[in-house]
Amino acid sequence: ISLNSHSSSILQINKEHTDAAPSAAFVDKEKVAIRKLDSISTAFDPFKKILLKIDTQGFEKNVLAGAERLIEQKVKIIQLEMSLLPLYEGIVPFEEMVSYLNRLNFKPLFYSPGYVDRTTEQIQQLEGYFIKNK
């Protein structure tokens, strides 16, 4: 758990991130249950297409891996946060995330700036929108 809740992650936060954003500092730990989206996908209306939004502070690829059936059958658009820098331990680099989404049959729709280091003005995270190939 980070001092500011929006930086909290299952992954360990890196020093570069807390140097750029001191309010992202680690303050506590909490146990949480993790379930794959595929394990609850039957709860979704089979005739509706889904926009899947993922904002898990570096754990996005794990979420995608646990939702491959849902993604194949029902998801039309994926919106997720992608890091340009390794802000968390074990984070998947931007290029690898785009390649993974391509393998899931999704192509980039557009990107928007996410987190920007106000000191260096460097974009550290992007919000990516991907649409399923027809």
Segment roles from a protein language model:
Residues 1-35:
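Glycine-rich adenosyl-binding loop in Rossmann-like folds that engage adenosine-containing cofactors
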